Amino acid sequence: MENTTTSPDVLERFLRYVQINTQSEDANCDQVPSSAVQFDLANVLAEELRELGAEDAHVAEHAYVCAHIPASVGAEDKPALGLIAHLDTTEVAPGAGVKPHIVHYEGGDLVCGTVDGKPVAMSTAKLPALNDLASEDLVCSDGSTLLGADDKAGVAEIMSLVARIAQDPSLPHPALGICFCPDEEIGHGAELLDIDTFGCKYAYTVDGGPIGELEWECFNAAEATVRFEGQSIHPGDAKGRMVNAGNLFCDFNALLPYVQRPEYTEGYEGFYHLEGVSATVDHATARYIVRDHDAAKFQQKLDLIDAAASMLNQRLGEKHVTVEIKQQYRNMAEIVRDYPELIDVAKEAYLACGVEPQVLPIRGGTDGAQLSFRGLPCPNLSTGGYCYHGVNEFVPVSSLVKMTDVLQELVARFA
């Protein structure tokens, strides 16, 4: 299909957005947004949406940016469609002071930048997809921070679509609900979105990876906090008396199957992921995330955590290990499988733009998981980005433009 806007629009937006720090903070997960800086991008987007004709664009109390675009002539009676992306970036890599730049990639190692005199590079051995990107212009960070394509690429693509419609309102589309959510990276992105006011029958998140990804299955997810209480005794008098909480953690961690760690799993294989641990002789705390697409296997993983704690307590003859499980989200396939038309239409939109759709299980979660269970079926589309959550993150310029084309084709099919 022909581009109806020049590529610099989506690119210019993306380059601006990634320079606004929006890292969420898991330590503040009891408040939304977890970081005040998310309001900085939220306010920019709301103002830009108003400039593009979305008169009701606003930033709600918890940093949700919401706006509505009227339907094109003849599509006024069609159900409203939502397009959703998230404001925040992950805190697992440096995210403030992003300095994006464009690398014309000619093959071999992709060097994003240089830090402390050393190149920050990604090899084709580690990322074979680079072999298909020779001669492409790639947006990278300078190697000292993540880029923020997750999910500011999705934000920019949605905003560029809105700009196209503002320029030519005759482009076919139903009424559109636009939403940019906070705190997706810490699992709270869709919790406080007012679905009734949003007013959409269906929605798509634009939060995937390389262009063509189409996802309607995600993990079942929980967080397990395991606490170990020790008993400190002078090590010279410790025999039969000391309980070392740090060693208890080591024993516990060894009871979880190492082949079910993220670095050994792929596809539909679930995992236990140790996100952090602090330990002394007296006290230790370990935080795991537990993931599996299959609900029964997911429950088995949670049961094994409880069983490991019980085994250690039984060995010690008293309770030194406690487990707290916090459910995070469920596999949205339970809901979305009843709406196959959402998958079919997305495939058609990709194909119309010359992109081969790749239907894959999400090895993670999106805002669409929560929204689907709250009554808004919501598959996930690609953004075009690669290597999320790290300093090697990048996105091809052509993918930013092509995904905007895909969104244009998508909304036309709902008109």
What is the role of each PLM region?
Residues C29-K78, G82-I84, D88, K99:
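A non-catalytic alpha/beta surface segment that caps or lines the substrate-entry region
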